[in-house]
Amino acid sequence: MRVVVGSLNPTKIEGVRRAFNQFFDDVIVKGVEVNSGVGNQPFNNDVVKGAINRAINSFQDCDFSVGIEAGLFSLKKTLTGYIDFQVAAIYNGKRITIGFGPGFEYPPVVLSLIHI
């Protein structure tokens, strides 16, 4: 099985390799550079859009492609008003599935460095 990750980030590639190896044998995973179509620090729906774009744009000579994007989501009643979530999109050439990783809140001092 061939899997392409829409990123050259070694941590993302290794994470995808480990995940697919839990369910399939003989998995070959490679990363490619693609355009996410969103900013460097995506917000809200752009985080999901970036993951989907990465998955679709990296689908080439493979069984599955994976797009991973992280970014801030507005969430009321939190200290800063934002939670960072990671989004993964898996594409088989016909259908996309989406999953979210655990969210966390940046300390206010870190969030103050991000232009929201």
Feature-to-residue mapping (PLM):
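N-terminal polybasic phosphate/anion-binding patch
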Residues: M1-D61
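Generic domain-boundary/flexible-linker signal
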Residues: E14, K76-K77, G99
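Structural signal for conserved beta-strand scaffold positions within catalytic alpha/beta enzyme cores
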Residues: G31-E33, G67, F100
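Glycine-rich phosphate-binding loop
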Residues: A55-A89
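Activity-critical C-terminal alpha-helical subdomain
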Residues: T97-V109
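Conserved small/polar residues in nucleotide/adenosyl-binding loops
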Residues: I114-I116
